[in-house]
From Swiss-Prot:
Keywords: Cell adhesion, Disulfide bond, Glycoprotein, Signal. Residues 1-18 form the signal peptide. This is A-agglutinin-binding subunit. The lineage of its organism: Eukaryota, Fungi, Dikarya, Ascomycota, Saccharomycotina. The gene is AGA2. The keyword Phosphoprotein does not apply. It holds the Pfam family AGA2.
Length: 87
């Protein structure tokens, strides 16, 4: 009798834990870039016969990964370099 009661309690606990651990598959967001550059570099550039100072901003891509179901999916965006020229 005690053994049946123990199994009954165990099955209730297992059911509650299974509900808590259920994975919810949602649409993953669109890929984005960080709003601030992680690095900057400068160099002197000669363009159209004029010397300029080039400022290069490097951005990291934010990648979202979903491992729901049998087909994992990701969204990512390339890490661009933003170039600015200072005269």
């Amino acid at each position: 009798m005690q053994l049946l009661r123990c199994f009954s309690i165990f099955s209730v606990i297992a059911s509650v834990l299974a509900q808590e651990l259920t994975t919810i598959c949602e649409q993953i967001p669109s890929p984005t870039l960080e709003s601030t550059p992680y690095s900057l570099s400068t160099t002197t550039i000669l363009a159209n016969g004029k010397a300029m100072q080039g400022v290069f901003e490097y951005y990291k891509s934010v990648t979202f990964v979903s491992n729901c179901g049998s087909h994992p999916s990701t969204t990512s965006k390339g890490s661009p370099i933003n170039t600015q020229y200072v005269f």
